[in-house]
């Protein structure tokens, strides 16, 4: 018979800091590999007053590549959300519902950073990805099936300090 095993997904990384998150290394929730199907990326959820990084920083929820099997697909990408300057009410709603509405959505900027050409350099140095796994092996009807890309969101609230509104 034909015996394969599915690989585990990437799991979840959640860091909530009251101050600055300094990441000069690697945070990953990458899908695993098995003898058959390859795992999807997991989830990374980082919240703090700021996020600092370096050229060596890697934040990845990528799906696992298929480089070993002729009969299985690569894992899909996971989800990454990095949140800066959110207040307690905004964080509570985001944790509970996964979105911000009403007064909690006021003065919020959400940048969609999906895909290889995303402008991540506005926010950080290094690599930020939730790409789908690459499929070097499986060809069906002349097409290679890779994992779908995941999502990357950079969510910013109002920075603390003096706010002057002139009318």
Show which residues each predicted segment covers.
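Glycine-centered low-complexity coil/loop motifs and glycine-rich tracts
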Residues: 1-14, 22-47, 54-85, 92-156
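Enriched but not universal
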Residues: 153, 158-167
């Amino acid at each position: 018979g034909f015996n394969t095993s599915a690989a585990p997904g990437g799991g979840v990384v959640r860091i909530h800091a009251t101050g600055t998150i300094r990441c000069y290394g690697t945070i990953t929730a990458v899908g695993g590999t098995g003898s058959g199907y390859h795992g999807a990326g997991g989830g990374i959820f980082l919240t703090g007053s700021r996020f600092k990084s370096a050229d060596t920083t890697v934040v990845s929820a990528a799906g696992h590549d298929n480089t070993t099997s002729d009969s299985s697909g690569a894992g899909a990408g996971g989800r990454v959300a990095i949140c800066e300057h959110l207040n307690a009410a905004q964080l509570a709603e985001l944790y509970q519902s996964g979105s911000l509405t009403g007064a909690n959505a006021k003065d919020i900027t959400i940048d969609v950073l999906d895909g290889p050409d995303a402008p991540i350099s506005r926010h950080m140095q290094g690599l930020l990805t939730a790409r789908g796994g690459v499929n070097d092996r499986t060809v069906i009807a002349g097409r290679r099936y890779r994992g779908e890309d995941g999502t990357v969101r950079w969510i910013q609230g109002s920075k603390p300090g003096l706010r002057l509104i002139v009318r």
